[in-house]
Amino acid sequence: MDTQVLEILFWFCCFLVFYAYLGYGILLYGLLSIKRLLTTKNTAPADLPDQSLPAVTFVVAAYNEEDWIEDKIRNCLDFDYPKDKIQYLFVTDGSNDQTPQRIRQYPLPKGVNLRLYHEDARRGKIAAVERIMAFVETPIVIYTDANTMVSKAAIRKIVRHYQNEKVGAVAGEKRIAMSDKDAANSAGEGIYWKYESALKRWDSEFYSVVGAAGELFSIRTELFEAVPQDTIIEDFVMTLGIAQKGYVVRYEPEAYAVESSSASVQEELKRKIRIAAGGLQAIARLRPLLNVFRYGWLSFQYISHRVLRWTLAPVALPLILLLNIALALQGLALYQILLALQLAFYLAAIAGYLLEKKQIKLKALFIPYYFCVMNYAVYRGFGRITRGRQSVMWERAKRAA
């Protein structure tokens, strides 16, 4: 193949990867800076006084969370929000440990409205949430996981966005708790979520967040629509579906859910494979959102922030290496240097993997390792989704103590 053609393909693939992971963030920040210059209006919503706060339903989906559930209840009871305006719904379908019993036996303070819904059959989180939506009696519903601790002011910060009738959903922030013991394991995961949080803040301010994480998000109850029972990442599909209707999804960094890091990168891989499979499934089911002429900025954000990471970027990575080898073999000095840098990066990732297996913690090597794991997960996810082997049931990753 002609050298010039190889060079064009090489740099095009480099651009895809760069844009998917860094370039979009740079471009978005630039566009946002221009918007700020042209707009003098303060877009930050004001907190509501107690008498104006809306009633909310706080939904906690739990499956075999006996180790966490009492902490979760205490966390809920500590919210800075009028108790007479919160309805707590705990759903524990399929749990066969002590989770339902511990909820029933928990000594609740007077005036707390907490209900437990339990079925022995396990049909997945989507089915459980859909079942209890019939019992929601408030205009706003907030969803969270049982093993995450939510910030005290979260509800108050979330509901202020609904003063704007165009807001259909609000995404909270996910934070990774790091201790000295698991600092190396969680380095890649923590940095990834910090960067994701920054992108979501900019997405929200520019136009709309493209999908929410299930650790903490909320919607207008009237906008709830059941998603197909085999949906893998229902939180993402649910909130993007609301955006597809013409509403915007806001991001609230002061409403955050704290979760322990995965016990190892290999444990995190389980989550990444499931999310990748779910992302590919979502792309197929949300095909209309790929039409930039119909959905404008929403499509631009969706393709740039999500679609490229789940499709073209992982494919481009091995092509970059192969094209780089071909160009370096032609004696081109620039490509020989770039090949050396690529090989050093992948060797660092392999070293991170080997050190993790030996329980040796070295944070610098976990970042390239984590990046490679993220992209490897897309291939595994693609294999699962095409073979129909990705279960809708959540496979819990072991968390650091």
Question: Locations of the language-model features?
Answer:
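N-terminal membrane-anchoring/stem segments of glycan-assembly enzymes
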Residues: 1-48
